[in-house]
Amino acid sequence: MREKTLYARLAWTGMRKNRRLYLPYLLSCAGMVLMFYILMGLSGSPVLEHMSGGGSSAIILRLGTVVIAVFALIFLFYTHSFLIRRREREFGLYNVLGMGKGNIARILLWETVITYGLTTGTGLLLGMVLYKLAELGMVRLLQVPVTYTLTVSVSSLLAAAALFAAIHTLILLNGLRQLHGVSAVGLLRSESVGEKPPKAQWVLTAAGAVLLAGAYWLAVSIREPLAALTWFFAAVLMVIAATYLLFISGSVTLCRGLQRNKKYYYRPQHFVSVSSMAYRMKRNGAGLASVCILATMVLVMISSTTCLYVGQEDAVNSRYPRDMDVAVYGRSDHPLDEAETEQLRQGVESTVFNFGGQTSNVATYREISVSGLPDGGDLRLGNAGASAADSTRVTQLHFLPLEDYNAATGQSLTLGDGQVYVAALRTDFPYDTLTVDGEWTFRVMDRDIPPLSGPFTADITPTLMVVIPHFTQFVQELEDGLSEKYGWYLTATWHYAFDTDLPENQQGNIDGTTPNLEDALNGYLAGVSSDWGVGVSVESKAANRADFYGTYGGLFFLGIMLSIVFIFAAVAILYYKQLSEGYEDQSRFDIMQKVGMTKVDIRRSINSQLLTVFYLPLVLAGVHLCFAFPFIHKLLILFNLDNRGLLIGTTAVSFAVFAVLYAIVYKLTGNTYYRIVAEDTEKE
């Protein structure tokens, strides 16, 4: 019986005596369990399930649980590998005293069991306690009524327990792999065996610089938001690879350059720190690169999701400039004539009146649309030979009658034969002429007219809104030409948008129970669709606002949760980096003090090393963020939010707050490093 408990006691004693190493690891494990449980529970929360807009939030949170699971696996592997390296000397001593590797494996097994039990139990307990607080915060972000019913998600408990059991099993197997094949002498000398100083690797440094320059060029050169979405992940991968190459290889090259600068290198505060950094920069560079990438992820997430959440009402108003939007679709060879549109207008207004409301701020207009690939100022409609890469260049072309545009905007614009006005959305159009499929050419009189808000802003593809005179004549010519050339029949649409004095819960189908104008209009238009053979749709700002809030609120909440996880991960990496360097530099500083280096000189050397290395990730993360700004702005346009000033503000505030937190971590970890390197000298 005592033999069975021996390994458990040895495991617990080893963890307790190495608590400086294990405590951050245990806290990280518990924090991952906590975050996973909360996100998993919220994604299936009955509160979100029964609220308007909750479906969008649930989907976003499910994606967040996948991110947490993958990140937990990678991060916990990284930190546990560090723990095993630091304890190799201890395991070597066990081996010398008669324990075989099988016995050491049993100690590791018990450490894994203890770690899993402590962290999973603590994480789930805190998760159940804090879950309701997170749910209340989520509900408040979605701006819906609060409920105070306490719930425990059994499925989330089981999922978290199973996931982290699998992760800890893999970590155990990796730890056994690290010890396999290492002799007792090798384990005992593991901390004393040094690495060869890495040489400056100019090829890898140049490769990193080229990759980073390429990613930055993509960020600033892409104009269309859809193309930005397509290339965003490629640019992210390029930045990650470049960051690792520059920190691992470029930092070594930098250290070699500093060593060649005798005035800088041969100073007490620089000599030890620079030589130490160059000696182990390959390992430290990877850690610093990880911190830089995590910092960039936090800054991008917080700045973009905060901008989305703060500007969500602007996005709603851009997509739905009026309370209601009625659209009737018909083929262009059978367009609605004036008598039919007047009948529809009277029918809509009568439906609103019978429901107890009135229309105001009315905008009614016709439009016809085609799509094709731009070739300079020519939009080619026959895209049979188009490649998959051309999909991001497909442009929507909407033609509106001049008289309808004037009526909708209150302007008095005029056009002659062959002249048009153009408004470009999510693309640039710098040309003086517009040609449609090489046959219909128009002179562009103005490229910057205000576009009509509403359905046009819903397209994520590049869009050109073209105001044209003699609309009916042009539509007939276009229809005849395209039907003969491609066999196409175009779709003509009549829009009738208006505000109403009805309360929001009576405007749209928000809760599925309250009688509302949206359902009444759909009932009226169903008869029109059946009798006339046309398509119809009704959109309510009030009903769709909940979906916007659900999506933007969910993204903001997920951004906060993931940022917390990534910040703690960055802190843990920095902490372990300082511990590792502190233990490795301890004997070196002891020797330097014995040959005349004072504690003041030691402190200066530490500050020099920390200031030179510690702030590099923050500075480079700031540079990454600046070049990512055009990408972020274009991606937000896909969410109907085009507010550059707001994005600049949220980005600046996010970086300032993060920099303050980073400075605090610098102070704390710097003190830890100093205490370690000064331990031997103070004992004397």
Give the positions of each predicted feature.
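Alpha-helical transmembrane segments, especially those used as permease/efflux helices
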Residues: 21-29, 34-38, 162-167, 195-308, ...
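Hydrophobic alpha-helical transmembrane segments of multi-pass inner-membrane transport and secretion
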Residues: 20-47, 56-92, 112-122, 126, ...
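Small-residue-rich transmembrane alpha-helices
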Residues: 31-45, 78-82, 89, 114-144, ...
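Juxtamembrane interface at the cytosolic side of transmembrane helices
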Residues: 78, 86, 178, 224, ...
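Short cytosolic juxtamembrane segments of multi-pass membrane proteins
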Residues: 2-6, 180-195, 583-584, 674-684
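A short amphipathic helical element positioned immediately N-terminal to and/or at the very start
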Residues: 4-18, 272-280
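Basic-flanked hydrophobic alpha-helices used for secretion and membrane insertion
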Residues: 315-568
